């Protein structure tokens, strides 16, 4: 173990206080010649690290799993999950939690190495990761953070100097992922499937203490836990929908209890507005299509509620009723959050009866004319309606008049309305073709400048800067349909 006081390591290991069935202690597998290719300076500082120290060889060795910082307690977490509806016992097959960094402000964040070698949960996998998917997770997770969407984050990416073998030979890499925690719906499913009520209670109590301490004294704290997670997920999914983000693999092991977005494998952002948009190559039935995401979140949360039944109430029928009552509230909470967000996207401060139909009409027209989701709202925000099939259509012109008169009815000025729109309609998202272009340059040519430029533009999605304009252009029709693969 290396001592790193100048660096800023301040690790704790509260997860290891859970019953040992929840994890396996295992060291990372060393790699031959690690090289740091990306470090997140601002995140490093907020975690209490000195970024310049993190660039030194001793710290790069930690990011590669060749050394451990003082206080590290590497472990692979066990969990279960419904993957495309099928239940499996799972676990960290190629990731290790090395500890929880306590920040200068007293916050706690998991530090996880992804691609750190095989674990008892690897299921015939090699425990390694390829450079492209690790850089992709870095780009998208940081873009999500800039969009103000709760997310895990990326501290560093190192190349390993070793190949990984998938369909082809690819350069290996390890991502250092930072999360409020890695406790998932699947973690609770794992506890419930093992049948120990004591273990289930231990996990629930730990989760409450870590994420929802305000409900610790609640007389029905496990019901309150379910309520809090439902609230967090309703807000999160609404935020996804409002920016056109499609996760692609909403299995229960990818739904966090903290309400953060996790696992950027086959995710992508929607170009043309279409409720049926799917990018993932393995989602052949469209289970996790854009328009299905709220329903799938409710389904996943129902699996959490099921797992909690043994501790919701001593009477099983009563426990079942509590679970059903709470799950039924998800759709109401989601709709409310989405509606509030959509009104902000259209500059609507007050509540009017016509607002719902105003929103629905616009979305219907966008789908009909295959309008670009992000750029339609961007154009409305800038009030520059260039020639597009949507903006040239008679029904849009009619809608535009209604919308303008609705804005004029408000007490707030139009200037304030457009300002609110600017703060809620990103002018830039990580366009799929731009992300691929950056990855191609980095992985194939070792040129990280394309990625750096993209990251710089994505860091301020609401800036409406002229420097970002080249990134606002949708892909050429030949670039569609875009397909994603579960590389992360």
From Swiss-Prot:
One of its GO terms (molecular function) is magnesium ion binding. Its EC number is 2.7.7.-, 2.7.7.108. The keyword Metal-binding applies. ATP binds at residues 91, 93-94, 114, 126-127, 177, 184, 263. Its cofactor is Mg(2+); Mn(2+). Mg(2+) binds at residues 254, 263. It holds the Pfam family SelO. It catalyses: L-seryl-[protein] + ATP = 3-O-(5'-adenylyl)-L-seryl-[protein] + diphosphate; L-threonyl-[protein] + ATP = 3-O-(5'-adenylyl)-L-threonyl-[protein] + diphosphate; L-tyrosyl-[protein] + ATP = O-(5'-adenylyl)-L-tyrosyl-[protein] + diphosphate; L-histidyl-[protein] + UTP = N(tele)-(5'-uridylyl)-L-histidyl-[protein] + diphosphate. The active site is at 253 (proton acceptor). Keywords: ATP-binding, Magnesium, Manganese, Metal-binding, Nucleotide-binding, Nucleotidyltransferase, Transferase. It comes from the Bacteria. Nucleotidyltransferase involved in the post-translational modification of proteins. It can catalyze the addition of adenosine monophosphate (AMP) or uridine monophosphate (UMP) to a protein, resulting in modifications known as AMPylation and UMPylation. Belongs to the SELO family. This is Protein nucleotidyltransferase YdiU. It comes from Bacillus cereus (strain 03BB102).
